[in-house]
């Protein structure tokens, strides 16, 4: 981990290896935006999957990604978090979506969770990005292939 607390290439590779152990075949159940303290550029999200014992994925976009054990967060705490536009959009497209794989490009600061019909990409360069891609089907119309949502304060 760098001095500023951001994941480097090795930490991302280790985190992806851990994700590959638990997430494939599980279902995304909930998507939360967690409240922020301090750093206004860090965006923190919690993804809850159906796999156990590590079913919570904590993502600080642009900073770090961790699988968290069930005991770390109480469900009743997360149920009272406010919903926002990004969470609603992701819930619309990824509600109960099955994880089919984790794609990682060695040496990069980028990985994506592959669902049945979408990719959820996490970029750890600079302030980071969270991008939802629709899987391309064999249609000629490519205008619907990317769904982008910007993360703003």
Regions found by a protein language model. Name each.
Residues 1-153:
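Acidic, proline/glycine-enriched N-terminal capping motif
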């Amino acid at each position: 981990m760098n001095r500023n607390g951001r994941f480097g290439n090795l930490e991302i590779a280790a985190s992806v290896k851990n994700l590959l152990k638990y997430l494939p075949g599980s279902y995304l159940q909930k998507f939360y935006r967690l409240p922020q303290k301090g750093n206004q550029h860090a965006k923190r999200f919690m993804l809850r999957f159906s796999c156990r014992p590590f079913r919570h994925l904590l993502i600080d976009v642009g900073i770090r990604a961790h699988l968290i054990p069930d005991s770390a967060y109480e469900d009743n705490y997360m149920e009272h978090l406010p919903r926002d536009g990004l969470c609603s959009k992701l819930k619309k497209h990824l509600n109960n979506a099955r994880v089919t794989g984790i794609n990682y490009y060695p040496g990069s600061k980028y990985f994506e969770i592959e669902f049945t019909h979408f990719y959820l990409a996490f970029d750890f360069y600079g302030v980071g990005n969270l991008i939802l891609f629709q899987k391309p089907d064999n249609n000629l119309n490519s205008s619907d292939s990317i769904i982008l949502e910007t993360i703003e304060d």
